[in-house]
Amino acid sequence: MGKIIGIDLGTTNSCVAIMEGNSVKVIENSEGARTTPSIIAYMEDGEILVGAPAKRQSVTNPKNTLYAVKRLIGRRFEEKEVQKDIGLMPYKIIKADNGDAWVEVRDQKLAPPQISAEVLRKMKKTAEDYLGEPVTEAVITVPAYFNDSQRQATKDAGRIAGLEVKRIINEPTAAALAFGLDKNEKGDRKIAVYDLGGGTFDVSIIEIADVDGEKQFEVLSTNGDTFLGGEDFDQRIIDYIIGEFKKEQGVDLSKDVLALQRLKESAEKAKIELSSSQQTEINLPYITADASGPKHLNLKITRAKLEALVEELIERTIEPCRVAIKDAGVKVGEIDDVILVGGMTRMPKVQEKVKEFFGKDPRRDVNPDEAVAVGAAIQGQVLSGDRKDVLLLDVTPLSLGIETLGGVMTKMINKNTTIPTKHSQVYSTADDNQGAVTIKVFQGEREMAAGNKLLGEFNLEGIPPAPRGTPQIEVSFDIDANGILHVGAKDKATGKENRITIKANSGLSEAEIEKMVKDAEANAEEDHKLRELADARNQGDALVHSTKKALTEYGDKLEAGEKEKIESALKDLEETLKSGSSDKAAIEAKIEVVATASQKMGEKMYADMQAAQGAEAAAAGAAGAGGAGASAGGASQQQDDVVDAEFKEVKKD
């Protein structure tokens, strides 16, 4: 069985790790970096760029370069968070036929899981290049506060990328695994994981206990905001720059897509620089132009200014911390360690706020960019059976229930219930002779069902006529270890049953996923063909260069017919290469013709080299012999009185 890899599929950056024995390896990608930007670019010729290459060209191709797609995964188009993003993103967010938020690129309609699958495929390839073998299984992390639709969509993304997702694991829980197994502290400890990433915020309170030599990680509570992260911090800086530039130059940059992309890049850099310095300068020449000519942007931003701009965002992370502490039934003073995860936690003001709330310095010995992928890799090792000393008890982040009479949300499973879990309850009909019931499943904490997230609905039909309140309908909820819900309804009188895995009326259908898997496989095949074509073209170019060089040196030693044959074959190959031909077989055939025609010249070159080496060796031998004679003669002239010693040959046994 191959290794199960751990993937942190992040909003801004992604990371992949594997376990090698008891040590973990965070794998560098083809560019040599341990994290990969979660950016995907769709090029005019159909090529798809992922990671750093996509990021590099984003300024010149903003409408077809997708980033922060994780903020759309598993979301409906009408959700206010999606509507907010529509105005901010340079790419086009559209409403899919099923009501989900999708993206339109180069006249193609793409689902967020399909786009995220490109990043997962890059992570898969990174691991395969390192291991030298195919990888088919993975543990993928999600924000702890992701709802059922978002978890299901992430699982779908894995499938489209050609991965069997063995487990969906919460990011803070993964970070706790990485921390808990790395440190050898004995006894029970309560830790708080504060995870502020590129697009999401989570906080989890986790108890790490030693139980008979086994480390047990029990999540006591979790809370968060799936639409709060580094992207929002960047946006505050961008808005500030736009405002200042408008005041100074009278030009509104918010309508200029190219300028916005440059501003985004600069805002991110400024934010990072201000974590280690007190002031930074944003310098963007030729940012735009008007009738009076080109405009240049030059602006100084201090750390104090940045902190003032984002203070409210940092403050928004504290309330979930309060709720998580309360839900866990612990006091702030009982928290032994505070772990910071996510790139945004490098910001000094964030660290200061966390220290202020928890009353202690956060740990500095956890890598905020890699801990989540490391934890996922550890869970992969547990699932493959190679590790027996770890037990992970995670929770469902939000309450689950059904809509009952009057639009009330009747909770079946409360938030922070340890998973996997099952719960069933008996309900009845609201009207006389009601022949069917519709079960509507919701997730959330509001009292009224309409205020929560509708996960899906289904019907139980064929209920025998009876007065209201008489039929007994048992509704069962079953949450698996991935946090994904399965619901069943059964008429106890007739035994009729209907069970579904909650696939919201949104989400991808099985047929759509199958199609995307096939498209992805076709893309991989196409990529392989393009790679082989590029290799053939490179081989052809190299052969043209080396043959021309050899002709310059040895052409006059060839018979006229032979030389013409080579020149004709060369011309043919060059023309094929210059025409941009995508016929690999034709290029290879022309390469073969040049190679065959050049055989005689190769033989002559080889013979000349042999002759030259022979001449050199002969010259060296003659020089050596002459030199020896001269020195011997000289010696005899100068030393006539020297007596020759007798010698005898000693034979070895």
From Swiss-Prot:
Post-translational modification Phosphothreonine, affected residues: T200
Protein name: Chaperone protein DnaK
Name of the coding gene: dnaK
Conditions for induction: By stress conditions e.g. heat shock.
InterPro entries, per the entry: ATPase_NBD (IPR043129), Chaperone_DnaK (IPR012725), Heat_shock_70_CS (IPR018181), HSP70_C_sf (IPR029048), HSP70_peptide-bd_sf (IPR029047), Hsp_70_fam (IPR013126)
Keyword Acetylation: no
Sequence ranges of Gly residues compositional bias: 623-632
Transmembrane segments: none
A molecular-function term among this protein's GO annotations: unfolded protein binding
Source organism (scientific name): Paraburkholderia xenovorans (strain LB400)
Annotated function: Acts as a chaperone.
Family: Belongs to the heat shock protein 70 family.
Region (Disordered): 615-653
Keywords attached to this entry: ATP-binding, Chaperone, Nucleotide-binding, Phosphoprotein, Stress response
